[in-house]
């Protein structure tokens, strides 16, 4: 009898888990959520900065005050020059004869190279962040609005490492592992650091540790990452930038009919620039050694006019 009661209680408990954890599940629910959390018009109809507006002068001063030891950590993974399952477009470096000069060539979007996404990089139903029409933004010479050049003055703010692999006591999360609000809040409790307006959230899944141990795999098809249900929480916290050691989204997508729901919600609905493929291994080790999970971060992409992003070497300063 006791066994039956326990099984019944367990089944009831599973049945009454909040549905929000799995929401949105399909394209209709996704559309509902997109419009519910949208930041379009929040900073004016002509805004091109999005959530970067929350990085105020006061926020920069607060971030600078976090520098205690002067330790710096790069968040960039060295450019991958060999074709692999996660690197369809290897970085090319050519020396020019006669001089110590070189030429670089890279198609950085994807799952190999550390880079930042501009707000014009993603669209939803033919509109970018703030409701600009595709036809008015996308041209052969680049984006007329929301290009990476909007961040020409750079970003200095508080960075917060959210290390879900360490939270779970593993070297890395297995590909396809979804990360929910419960996980983010459990990390806040463990680390003692609560996300706040203007912050850059950096999510470590251990992707690069797994790659170093087991070799490359198709990250586009299978990667640990955020579930789309975290988007309202990210807006509530006021996060300005989100980065991870893969592409932020859990893959494959858990929202039927939507390929990259987190990219779409964060970039297009909320106006949040994403930092893809950051190497957070050294950052995780340094933060653990210092027992400090917050730091100053600098983000300074080359301001290509109308660019959809740029390779990035973000720096954390403790």
Question: Model regions: which residues?
Answer:
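Sec-dependent signal peptide recognition
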Residues: 1-7
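Active-/binding-site microenvironments in catalytic and ligand-binding cores
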Residues: 17-318
């Amino acid at each position: 009898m006791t066994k039956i009661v326990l099984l019944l209680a367990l089944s009831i408990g599973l049945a009454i888990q909040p549905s929000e954890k799995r929401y949105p599940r399909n394209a209709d629910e996704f559309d509902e959520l997109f419009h519910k959390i949208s930041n379009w018009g929040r900073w004016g109809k002509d805004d091109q900065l999005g959530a970067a507006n929350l990085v105020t002068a006061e926020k920069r001063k607060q971030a600078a005050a976090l520098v205690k030891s002067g330790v710096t950590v790069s968040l960039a993974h060295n450019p991958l020059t060999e074709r692999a399952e996660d690197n369809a477009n290897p970085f090319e470096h050519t020396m020019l004869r006669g001089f110590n000069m070189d030429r670089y060539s890279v198609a950085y979007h994807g799952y190999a190279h550390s880079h930042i996404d501009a707000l014009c990089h993603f669209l939803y139903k033919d509109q970018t962040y703030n409701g600009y029409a595709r036809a008015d933004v996308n041209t052969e010479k680049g984006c007329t609005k929301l290009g990476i050049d909007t961040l020409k003055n750079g970003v200095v703010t508080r960075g917060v490492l959210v290390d879900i692999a360490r939270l779970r006591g593993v070297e890395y999360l297995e590909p396809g592992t979804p990360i929910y609000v419960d996980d983010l809040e459990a990390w806040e409790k463990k680390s003692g650091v609560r996300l706040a307006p203007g912050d850059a959230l950096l999510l470590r899944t251990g992707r690069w540790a797994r790659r170093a141990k087991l070799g490359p795999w198709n990250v586009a098809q299978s990667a640990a990452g955020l579930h789309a249900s975290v988007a309202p929480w990210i807006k509530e916290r006021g996060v300005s930038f989100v980065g991870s050691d893969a592409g932020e989204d859990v893959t494959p997508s858990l929202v039927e009919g939507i390929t990259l729901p987190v990219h779409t919600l964060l970039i297009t609905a909320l106006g949040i620039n994403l930092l893809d493929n950051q190497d957070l291994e050294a950052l995780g080790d340094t933060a653990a050694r210092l027992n400090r999970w917050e730091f100053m971060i600098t983000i300074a992409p080359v301001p290509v006019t109308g660019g959809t992003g740029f390779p990035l070497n973000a720096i954390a300063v403790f």
